[in-house]
Swiss-Prot record:
This is Large ribosomal subunit protein uL22. InterPro entries: Ribosomal_uL22, Ribosomal_uL22_bac/chlpt-type, Ribosomal_uL22_bac/org-type, Ribosomal_uL22_sf. It comes from Sulfurovum sp. (strain NBC37-1). One of its GO terms (molecular function) is rRNA binding. Pfam families: Ribosomal_L22. SUPFAM superfamilies: Ribosomal protein L22 (SSF54843). The gene is rplV. Belongs to the universal ribosomal protein uL22 family. This protein binds specifically to 23S rRNA; its binding is stimulated by other ribosomal proteins, e.g. L4, L17, and L20. It is important during the early stages of 50S assembly. It makes multiple contacts with different domains of the 23S rRNA in the assembled 50S subunit and ribosome. The globular domain of the protein is located near the polypeptide exit tunnel on the outside of the subunit, while an extended beta-hairpin is found that lines the wall of the exit tunnel in the center of the 70S ribosome. GO terms for cellular component: cytosolic large ribosomal subunit. Gene3D superfamilies: Ribosomal protein L22/L17 (3.90.470.10). Disulfide bonds: none annotated. Part of the 50S ribosomal subunit. One of its GO terms (biological process) is translation.
Length: 112
């Protein structure tokens, strides 16, 4: 089993979790192929983290499956935007930590 962790990436954790749930449990090669055609910003980021996790374990993408793909909330950058009558509105720029773990793929008929 190998893992890759990307910290403080500038993407909303809630939006990235939608993509992470789609690829969890998939074969790594199939996940990378499907993420390539998703229009989301998070899809490209998660794709790179999956490729890094596969490379960290010296595996080939077709030999492994994604055992865990987790997106956690990180620090939030706060900015201010001037508004009418001297007031200000807060701009929230969320960041996320993305953790991907890959392990050997189970063969058909093989139990845990």
């Amino acid at each position: 089993m190998s893992r890759a962790l990307l910290k403080f990436v500038r993407v909303s954790p809630t939006k990235a979790r939608l993509i992470a749930r789609e690829v969890q449990g998939m074969n790594a090669e199939l996940a990378l192929a499907s993420l390539e055609f998703m229009p989301n910003k998070a899809a490209g980021i998660i794709s790179k983290v999956i490729a890094s996790a596969v490379a960290n374990g010296d595996f080939e993408p077709e030999e492994v499956e994604i055992t865990s793909c987790r997106v956690d909330k990180a620090a939030v950058m706060k900015r201010w935007r001037p508004r009418a009558r001297g007031t200000a509105s807060r701009i929230i720029k969320p960041t996320a930590h993305i953790l991907v773990e890959v392990g050997p793929a189970k063969k058909d008929g093989e139990d845990a």
